[in-house]
Amino acid sequence: MVCLLKIMPIFKKQSLEHYLRSRFGPAATLLSYGPIGKESSKGTYKQYGYGSPIKVTFRIGTLRRHAVLETMSPGPFGHEHMADRAQAILWDYESYGRLPRHVKALDVGAFTSTQTLFSVAKAREFFVLTEWTEGASYHEDLQRLVEGGSLRTLDRRRTRALATYLAGIHRRRRRDPPLYRRRLRELIGHGECIMGLTDSYPVPFGFITQDVLAAIEDACNQWRWRLRNKTHRLSQVHGDFHPWNVLFRRGTDFSVLDRSRGEWGEPADDVTSMVINYLLLSLCRWRRLHGPFELLFRLFWDTYLEQSGDEEVMAVAAPFFAFRGLVIASPVWYPKLPMEVRRRIFRFVENVLGASRFDPARVNEYCGL
C-alpha cells in the first residue's frame, strides 16, 4: 500500500484505522503498525534510501492481513518537491501489478496536513482549477508591430514593466546547491527542454541534421559544467515567461499564467524566454533584429540589468538561449516558419554557445549578419 507524503508523519492510530475502514470496509480493525527496513540503511555498502516503509497489520472480520505503507522523503535525487514524490508514487501504483512476481499495490493515497489519509486510486488524470483573469495576451502587442504598427509609448512602458517584474521576483534567493544543479540537469535532459526538443526534430530537416543537434547538446552540457558551481544564483522564477503567458489589462497592469518546471531556478531562464521573442518576430519581419523589436530587446535588457544589478546573467545566458532557440526554430512548435529564419536562429544559438559571455549589442552578429 503506497501513499503520498511530504514529510514522514507521526501516525495516529485513529487516523490509520479510519483509512483502513474507508478502504477495506467497516469490519477492518488495526492491530499494529511500525517501521521496517531499517537494516537497509545500516548495511556495509548501502546507506541511503528514499523512504520509510511502515508495516501495517489489520484484521477484516476473522482474516488477518499485512500491508506495507510506503512514503518518500524529500531528497536531492529529483525528489525535492512534493510533485516529484507524488509522480514517483503514482507511477508505483500504476506499474507494480504489471510486472510478473512484483508485489501488488493495494491503493495509492495522500495525507492531509492533519495526517488524515485518503485514497486517490480512482484518479486517471489530474487537473488544476485556477481563477479567471481578464486581459489580452502580450503577443497581440508584438504581433501588431510585426504587421507594421507603430511603436507606442505604452509598448516601452510594458517592456520596462515586464523586466522590472522579473528583477523583482529574482531578488528572492534560496541557498540550495543541489537544487540549482538539478535545474541545470533538467535544462539539458528534461523532456520539455533541450534533449526533449532535439529528439522532437524530424531529421534531416533542411540544414538541421543529427550532427547539428548533437553539437548543440554537447555545447550545452559543457555550459552545465561551467555553471554548476554558481549555486548562489538560485532564485524564484516563473519558468516559462513568454508573451503568451502574460495578460495585460489597462496600461502596465498585467497577470502571468502557467509557471513551469519549478519555483526556483536560474534567472537567465526567464530573461531569455521573453527577449528571444523580440528576436524571433523581428527575424520574421526584417530577417534581423531591427526597428521596434531591437529597441524593445535592448530596453528589456537595460531595464533588467538596472533593476537587478545582475551583470552575471549575461555570463550564464547561453544554454538558456539555446533552449529557447530550439523551441522557436522547431518545426513542431512553429511549422510555418521560413527556413531562412530557422537558419538564423540556429546560427544565433551556435554563436552564443561559442561566446564566453552574451552581449546584447551583438545579436545580429550572432545571427550571422
Give short role names for the model-derived ranges.
Residues F126, E131-T133, R172, L179-R226, ...:
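Active-site catalytic-loop/activation-segment of kinase and kinase-like phosphoryl-transfer enzymes
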Residues R157, G309-F321:
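All-alpha amphipathic helical-bundle segments outside canonical DNA-binding/catalytic cores
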Residues S41-T44, G49-S52, T57-H190:
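Conserved ATP-binding subdomain of kinase catalytic cores across diverse folds
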Residues M1-A67, P76-A88, R98-A105, E147, ...:
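Regulatory N- and C-terminal appendages and interdomain linkers associated
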Residues R261-W264, A268-S308, A322-E340:
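Active-site activation/catalytic loop segments of kinase-like enzymes and analogous catalytic loops
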Residues P100-A105, R171-R181, Y201-P204, L227-T231, ...:
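Surface-exposed helix-capping loop/turn segments at secondary-structure junctions
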Residues G43-V68, I169, N221-D269:
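Active-site acidic catalytic loop and adjacent metal/ATP-binding pocket
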Residues P74-G75, F127, E131-L151, G196-F205, ...:
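A glycine-centered beta->alpha junction motif in the catalytic cores
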